[in-house]
């Protein structure tokens, strides 16, 4: 049941164009009573409207908690999304949350955008 619920949360939700901040979030499903195992999944969220990485996490964590899940921010960075050229580049870090594991974020993004060139680097801010 928990895993089915987590599957309903999209792995990736990012703006369609531009350079913007993003966060990598781990979502926890509440385990059935008596079951010590907790189902988790990582999700990527990035939006142009966010002035700070925390703005994204605060909005998304509120939505996640309303659905009965818990979550934590694993880090952040920036995304350059060029939809015309079908390119996405993940880089940088968050001052508040630290650097996200861009390799994990990139794999999630590649799954959603299979016909894009998706790259990442640890440099830049």
Swiss-Prot record:
Swiss-Prot/TrEMBL catalytic activity: N(pros)-phospho-L-histidyl-[protein] + H2O = L-histidyl-[protein] + phosphate; N(tele)-phospho-L-histidyl-[protein] + H2O = L-histidyl-[protein] + phosphate
The keyword Acetylation appears for this protein: yes
UniProt entry keywords in alphabetical sequence: Acetylation, Cytoplasm, Hydrolase, Protein phosphatase
Family assignment from sequence similarity: Belongs to the janus family.
Intracellular or extracellular location(s): Cytoplasm
Superkingdom of the source species: Eukaryota
Described purpose of this protein according to its UniProt entry: Exhibits phosphohistidine phosphatase activity.
An annotated GO BP: lamellipodium organization
InterPro entries per record: Janus (IPR007702), Janus_sf (IPR038596)
Gene3D superfamilies documented for this protein: Janus/Ocnus (3.50.20.20)
Quaternary structure annotation from Swiss-Prot or TrEMBL: Monomer.
Enzyme class: hydrolase
Pfam families the record matches: Ocnus (PF05005)
PTM annotation (N-acetylalanine): residues: 2
Active-site feature positions: 53
GO cellular component: cytosol; leading edge of lamellipodium; nuclear body; plasma membrane
Binding positions (substrate): 21, 94-96
Name the record gives this protein: 14 kDa phosphohistidine phosphatase
Enzyme Commission number(s) from the entry: 3.9.1.3
GO molecular function, one term: calcium channel inhibitor activity
């Amino acid at each position: 049941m928990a895993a089915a619920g987590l599957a309903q949360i999209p792995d990736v939700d990012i703006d369609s164009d531009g350079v913007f901040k993003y966060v990598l979030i781990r979502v926890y499903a509440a385990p059935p009573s008596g079951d010590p195992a907790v189902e988790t999944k990582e999700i990527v969220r990035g939006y142009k409207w966010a002035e700070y990485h925390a703005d994204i996490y605060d909005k998304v964590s509120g939505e996640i908690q309303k659905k009965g899940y818990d979550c934590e921010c694993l880090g952040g960075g920036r995304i350059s999304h060029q939809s015309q050229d079908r390119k996405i580049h993940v880089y940088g870090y968050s001052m508040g949350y630290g650097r996200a594991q861009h390799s994990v974020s990139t794999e999630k993004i590649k799954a959603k955008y299979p016909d894009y060139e998706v790259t990442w680097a640890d440099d830049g801010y």
